[in-house]
């Protein structure tokens, strides 16, 4: 095998070029680390400055729509004061506010929302009381008892009294008799019902009616006909009308009581 020939005298070896990493690859490699660094920096700045930024949007007001009495307005605002104190627009606990509001006995339904930049707004549907039951609770128009005597004016509500377990039946009597009496512009101011469901009604003209549950609708209609034809002109002189008779009624005049 022939030996390598020596390089000619005076000839120089060409330097070997180092092949570098292309710029595109260097940039591609560096970008993820740059992004990681940027995200870390943003996160650090958020931790440092975000609380201070959010403190610039504190909750200053609680708006309540749908509440028709200042007593109930004040009660709901007082109940929510601790939940919104020191809270900001973004951190205010809407679910807790909803639960606290819905827990008030006179609230039928409520919705809660934020209103930029510093307000929580509640839209409330109130329970509408139609009667006072046994001087201890109110009864809503859907027949549900609820405790809120101090939150309503009771003078304009009829006062119904009867066996605790007979509320539904008593309310049925009240609505049915009230509808019949309304035909002659009479209304029930109070009603006492005993265990046998005999009712004593005091009307808005101070007249007292006594009626038992047997055929009470027929008996009330008979009274309405008599009232429209005879008793209306002297109704203030009538103290009591007893309707517990199959075919008639007993009228007691005020002069008879004195």
From Swiss-Prot:
It is found in: Cell inner membrane. Residues 1-29 are cytoplasmic. InterPro entries: Cell_div_FtsQ/DivIB_C, FtsQ, FtsQ_C_sf, POTRA, POTRA_FtsQ_type. Keywords: Cell cycle, Cell division, Cell inner membrane, Cell membrane, Membrane, Transmembrane, Transmembrane helix. Belongs to the FtsQ/DivIB family. FtsQ subfamily. The gene is ftsQ. The chain crosses the membrane at residues 30-50. Residues 51-258 are periplasmic. One of its GO terms (cellular component) is cell division site. GO terms for biological process: cell septum assembly; FtsZ-dependent cytokinesis. This is Cell division protein FtsQ. It comes from Alcanivorax borkumensis (strain ATCC 700651 / DSM 11573 / NCIMB 13689 / SK2). It holds the Pfam family FtsQ_DivIB_C. Its main location: membrane. It comes from the Bacteria. Residues 57-127 form the POTRA domain. It is a single-pass type II membrane protein. The keyword Cell division applies. Essential cell division protein. May link together the upstream cell division proteins, which are predominantly cytoplasmic, with the downstream cell division proteins, which are predominantly periplasmic. May control correct divisome assembly. Part of a complex composed of FtsB, FtsL and FtsQ.
């Amino acid at each position: 095998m022939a030996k390598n020939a020596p390089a000619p005298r005076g000839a120089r070896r060409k330097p070997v070029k180092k092949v570098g990493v292309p710029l595109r690859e260097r940039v591609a490699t560096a970008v993820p680390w740059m992004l990681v660094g940027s995200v870390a920096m943003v996160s650090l700045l958020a931790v440092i400055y975000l609380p201070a930024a959010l403190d610039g949007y504190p909750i200053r007001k609680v708006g309540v729509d749908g509440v028709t009495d200042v007593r109930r307005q004040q009660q709901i605002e007082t109940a929510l004061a601790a939940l919104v104190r020191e809270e900001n627009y973004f951190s205010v606990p809407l679910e807790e506010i909803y639960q606290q509001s819905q827990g008030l006995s006179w609230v039928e339904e409520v919705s809660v929302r934020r209103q930029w930049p510093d307000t929580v707004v509640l839209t409330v549907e109130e329970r509408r009381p139609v009667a006072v039951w046994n001087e201890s609770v109110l009864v809503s128009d859907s027949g549900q008892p609820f405790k809120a005597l101090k939150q309503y004016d009771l003078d304009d509500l009829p006062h119904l009294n009867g066996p605790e377990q007979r509320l539904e039946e008593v309310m049925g009597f009240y609505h049915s008799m009230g509808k019949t009496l309304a035909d002659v512009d009479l209304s029930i101011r109070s009603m006492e019902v005993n265990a046998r469901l005999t009712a004593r009604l005091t009307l808005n003209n101070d007249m007292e009616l006594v009626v038992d549950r047997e055929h009470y609708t027929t008996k009330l209609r008979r009274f309405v006909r008599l009232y429209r034809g005879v008793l209306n002109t002297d109704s203030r002189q009538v103290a009591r009308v007893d309707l517990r008779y199959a075919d008639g009624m007993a009228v007691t005049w005020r002069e008879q009581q004195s």
